[in-house]
Amino acid sequence: MNSPYRGRFAPSPTGPLHFGSLVAAVGSYLDARTQGGEWLVRMEDVDTPRNVPGAADDILRTLDAFGFEWDGPVLYQSKRFEAYAEALDRLKQAGLLYGCACSRKEIADSATHAAIDGGLAYPGTCRGGLPAGRQARAWRLRVDAGETAFIDRLQGRVAQHLEHDVGDFVLRRADGLFAYQLAVVVDDAWQGINAVVRGADLLASTPRQIWLQRCLGYLELTYAHLPVAANPAGEKLSKQTRAQALSVDRAAAELVRALRFLGQGVPEALARGAAADVWAWAGEHWTFDAVPRQSLILLPA
């Protein structure tokens, strides 16, 4: 990486931070700080109906209470709609974007196979033009049949054939909202992010983001996808799986737990002290090579 390291943590304000969020924050923070880099915070609140009132402020208070120090102002995607619209216009002018009239039921009826992320691969129904009498509901980005690949610092080589594995994907939804894939790519470029460290639940999205970066002429980033924390049933910790909110009264203990999850040999005694002491230890001893290479780790019951 020729430019100075510039990373970020980008939670969605759909609820309080939980242990899975903390793992991603700790991993991205220490990877940046131990390389003399910057670490930014972005609120990925582009999907406005899912936002919980007060959650963004609660997330920032929790990060602060745990001792995270971010660089610059927090960026809110909900204030960036003009930038996303401009990116869409560029793609339209380049002939890379097209209107899609398909409903979910129509896609389900015509799709021939599942997408790599568990949905359905779009069969390209509207790629050659809208059916007579139909209007665009969403806007899709054209992909091709070639391979889109990258080397993840943890997960190794990752490759997808987007046309088969995903199909042309949505950048503006039928409800008028901008899709996550568009917002994250535009914001990473605008903020000068060049290193992404995040959970492996987003690994399957990365080839789409790389494709979009290329379509917009953006620089490509380096990626490291950390193992995801899962409950004993194998479900990723989330609001939907009733993950417990972090307690600021247990900051040191939770930081030690996150570091151990990430393969670091942090002394257990630090869990009974101050968060600042945990950070001091981590700043001296963080070892990226010790981070587990698997994509998911079950937490004990």
Curated annotation (Swiss-Prot):
Its EC number is 6.1.1.-. The keyword Acetylation does not apply. A motif ('KMSKS' region) lies at residues 236-240. A motif ('HIGH' region) lies at residues 11-21. One of its GO terms (cellular component) is cytosol. Its cofactor is Zn(2+). L-glutamate binds at R8, F9, A10, P11, S12, E44, Y180, R198. Gene3D superfamilies: HUPs. Keywords: Aminoacyl-tRNA synthetase, ATP-binding, Ligase, Metal-binding, Nucleotide-binding, Zinc. ATP binds at K239. The keyword Aminoacyl-tRNA synthetase applies. Zn(2+) binds at C100, C102, Y122, C126. One of its GO terms (molecular function) is ATP binding. Binds 1 zinc ion per subunit. It comes from the Bacteria. Belongs to the class-I aminoacyl-tRNA synthetase family. GluQ subfamily. Catalyzes the tRNA-independent activation of glutamate in presence of ATP and the subsequent transfer of glutamate onto a tRNA(Asp). Glutamate is transferred on the 2-amino-5-(4,5-dihydroxy-2-cyclopenten-1-yl) moiety of the queuosine in the wobble position of the QUC anticodon. This is Glutamyl-Q tRNA(Asp) synthetase. The lineage of its organism: Bacteria, Pseudomonadati, Pseudomonadota, Betaproteobacteria, Rhodocyclales.
